[in-house]
Amino acid sequence: MKTSQEQHVCGSTVVQTINAPLPLVWSILRRFDNPKTFKHFVKTCKLRSGDGGEGSVREVTVVSDLPASFSLERLDELDDESHVMVISIIGGDHRLVNYQSKTTVFVAAEEEKTVVVESYVVDVPEGNTEEETTLFADTIVGCNLRSLAKLSEKMMELT
């Protein structure tokens, strides 16, 4: 039997294949201090504490098209060997309460391709359904991963 709290949590996984090698993709993705390079919803990013490694906290201001203006995010895990990054949203003026994402990067079966898998869990805000919350978060994550793919592939063309 689910508790009241469990009924108000949702999550999803978004997968993106990128036509670029893992080291290139990871070098862009792992930059906790500079998400603006591929996240188009980010207007500015400033480290509030830390040096960009595990435990660092960043303040991200977002573009005016979103129903928020800023987010406080903590880097919970950054594993350069396993290519895993875990980020938690710990504050802000948005509805993504208790949001935590885990992004894992793999070498694809096809040569020179990379697979990025981002999964998340988040509280469902009062007045919203799981479907609405998942659709919103999936849209943001999907846009970010497509942008990461586009940037990585463009950088490949330049090499």
Swiss-Prot record:
Site (Involved in ABA binding): 87
UniProt: abscisate binding residues: 39, 68-73, 95-101, 118
Notes concerning its domains: Upon interaction with ABA, the 'latch' and 'gate' loops change in conformation leading to a tight dimerization and the creation a surface that enables the receptor to dock into and inhibit the PP2C active site.
Gene3D superfamilies found in the cross-reference section: 3.30.530.20
Subunit: Homodimer. Binds ABA on one subunit only. Binds to CARs protein in an ABA-independent manner, both at the plasma membrane and in the nucleus. Interacts with HAB1, and possibly with other PP2Cs.
Top-level taxonomic group: Eukaryota
Organism: Arabidopsis thaliana (Mouse-ear cress)
Protein name: Abscisic acid receptor PYL12
Region (START-like): 3-153
Motif Latch loop, chain ranges: 94-96
Family: Belongs to the PYR/PYL/RCAR abscisic acid intracellular receptor family.
